[in-house]
């Protein structure tokens, strides 16, 4: 897919040559000046007339009309050099690859060094490029009858750079791994729930474990009953599909200590139970396992890159259905931790299955906990659809998660958990906890509830209800599942201190 070369010449035969262009007042230089000379000054003229733009994420195409071996020049606007960030560069590459895909180009050459600044070196640019390629060109395969005519797509990208070839190849590999794993998560989330049950999710995890030599454990219903996972089992009561508690373990150190626990909500479809969702809210509830997908995507990256860390991934997988056996408002259930819970809302089921998953992650030695869940509609009201809500009991761990999210462009914002919030989730008159104390501060109530099970273990909760799916196409992908938090979790593990 990617080939690294050093000597760039306009006489080289390519369908497309891609060049980065910054906004600046000085005369054209480097490869852009060479393009201008070959085309008899046309680049300068088109820049002056606005047909070529160096503004952020503007893509301009110029045909060379046989004045060079390269057929077409694509200029990628990058804005002011001092304002270019890794995230903006990744988006610019994403827009480029979408443009090339729409134009049905099958190969391209990229002058990588034209995308480099004093803050973004060639390795960063190579990572951004390869990651953006996979993210931007992703398509969910779907289930329509296939057309006989194969669709044209980019099959070859040649990267020209004067940087160390081995280092660039390594950066391209890492970016590709990040992009592919995010797409794996997207596909899981986009898959209809009749084709992705808890058993299917468990089978996927086992395949991942076998590929990357993870230790794994799949708890069946009988196992959960013996362990006292009453919160998880309550949610599954109404379903004909048995629950699965999925555990993957990666050991990158000699001893099993300082273990990072990744916990992902795996509700494969959520009707709301007897606290039934309205029709409009039930559509797309196949995506209620996006937290599980994020954790599995992160484990794919971990399996490929083999960081020197210890990681345990725990995923409670079930659907939340209605039947004569389903759990009900006013039920009292006992979690694996021994804490009792009064159910006031069967549509607040995610926190119930996560409660037992968090306890089980601690049972497997998790020293730090990060849970990821499409937990509440309240977080969408609070933060919208571009920012993930976060809550924590540990400043140092949160800062590491925050740094990882900033690096990957998956932005988070911290919400508080006060003593008053804790009192509200402990407000039941007949049980230790209340799973839904009220609508006020609903996102915080979900986090505060989970904090009761994290207890003193350093913990960060990530509510991705607003960010796991997008209704609009964007520079780094189509509408549908985003694969949010795959890259943040993997980056956190890689950089963890």
UniProtKB/Swiss-Prot annotation:
Catalytic activity: Release of an N-terminal amino acid, Xaa-|-Yaa-, in which Xaa is preferably Leu, but may be other amino acids including Pro although not Arg or Lys, and Yaa may be Pro. Amino acid amides and methyl esters are also readily hydrolyzed, but rates on arylamides are exceedingly low; Release of an N-terminal amino acid, preferentially leucine, but not glutamic or aspartic acids
Known cofactor(s): Mn(2+)
Record localization: Cytoplasm
One GO term (biological process): proteolysis
Cited PROSITE patterns: CYTOSOL_AP
Coiled coil, from the record: none
Database matches in Pfam families: Peptidase_M17, Peptidase_M17_N
Gene3D superfamilies attached to this UniProt entry: Leucine Aminopeptidase, subunit E, domain 1 (3.40.220.10), Zn peptidases (3.40.630.10)
Keywords: Aminopeptidase, Cytoplasm, Hydrolase, Manganese, Metal-binding, Protease
Assigned EC number: 3.4.11.1, 3.4.11.10
InterPro entries in UniProt: Leucine_aapep/pepB (IPR011356), Macro_dom-like (IPR043472), Peptidase_M17_C (IPR000819), Peptidase_M17_leu_NH2_pept (IPR023042), Peptidase_M17_N (IPR008283)
Residue numbers binding Mn(2+) 2: 265, 270, 288, 349
PANTHER family named among the record's database cross-references: CYTOSOL AMINOPEPTIDASE, LEUCINE AMINOPEPTIDASE-RELATED
HAMAP family, per database record: Cytosol_peptidase_M17
Protein name: Probable cytosol aminopeptidase
Source species: Geobacillus sp. (strain WCH70)
């Amino acid at each position: 897919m990617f080939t690294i070369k050093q000597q760039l010449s306009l006489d080289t035969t390519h369908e497309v040559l891609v060049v980065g262009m910054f906004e600046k007042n000085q005369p054209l230089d480097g490869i852009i000046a060479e393009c201008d000379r070959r085309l008899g000054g046309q680049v300068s003229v088109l820049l002056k007339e606005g047909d070529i733009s160096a503004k952020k994420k503007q893509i301009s195409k110029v045909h060379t009309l046989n004045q060079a071996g390269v057929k077409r020049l694509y200029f990628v606007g990058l804005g002011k050099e001092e304002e270019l960030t890794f995230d903006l560069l990744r988006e610019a590459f994403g827009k480029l690859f979408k443009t090339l895909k729409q134009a049905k180009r099958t190969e391209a050459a990229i002058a990588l060094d034209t995308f480099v600044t004093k803050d973004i070196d060639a390795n960063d640019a190579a990572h951004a490029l390869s990651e953006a390629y996979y993210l931007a060109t992703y398509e969910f395969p779907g289930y329509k009858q296939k057309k006989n005519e194969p669709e044209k797509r980019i099959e070859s990208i040649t990267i020209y750079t004067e940087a160390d070839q081995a280092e660039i190849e390594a950066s391209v590999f890492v970016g590709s791994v990040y992009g592919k794993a995010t797409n794996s998560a997207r596909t899981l989330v986009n898959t209809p729930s009749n084709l992705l049950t808890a058993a299917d999710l468990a089978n996927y995890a086992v395949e991942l474990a076998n590929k990357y030599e993870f230790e794994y454990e799949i708890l069946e219903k009988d196992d959960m009953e013996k362990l006292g996972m009453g919160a998880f089992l309550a949610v599954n009561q109404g379903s004909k599909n048995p629950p699965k508690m999925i555990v993957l373990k990666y050991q990158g150190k000699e001893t099993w200590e300082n273990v990072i626990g990744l916990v992902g909500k795996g509700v494969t479809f959520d009707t709301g139970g007897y606290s039934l969702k309205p029709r409009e809210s039930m559509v797309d509830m196949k995506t209620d396992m996006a937290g599980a997908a994020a954790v599995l995507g992160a484990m794919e990256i971990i399996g490929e890159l083999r960081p020197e860390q210890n990681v345990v991934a725990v995923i409670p997988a079930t659907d939340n259905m209605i039947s004569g056996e389903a759990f009900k408002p006013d039920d009292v259930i006992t979690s694996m931790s021994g804490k009792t819970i009064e159910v006031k809302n069967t549509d607040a089921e995610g926190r119930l299955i996560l409660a037992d998953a968090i306890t089980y992650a601690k049972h497997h030695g998790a020293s730090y906990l990060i849970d990821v869940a499409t937990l509440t509609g309240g977080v969408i009201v609070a933060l919208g659809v571009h920012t993930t809500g976060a809550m924590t009991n540990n400043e140092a761990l949160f800062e590491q998660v925050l740094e990882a999210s900033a690096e990957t462009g998956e932005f988070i914002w911290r919400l508080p958990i006060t003593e008053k919030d804790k009192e509200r989730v402990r407000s039941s008159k007949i049980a230790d906890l209340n799973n839904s104390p009220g609508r006020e501060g609903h996102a915080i109530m979900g986090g505060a509830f989970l904090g009761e099970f994290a207890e003193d273990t350093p913990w960060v909760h990530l509510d991705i209800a607003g960010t796991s799916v997008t209704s609009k196409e964007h520079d780094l992908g189509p509408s549908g599942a985003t694969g949010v938090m795959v890259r943040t979790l993997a980056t956190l593990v890689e950089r963890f201190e």
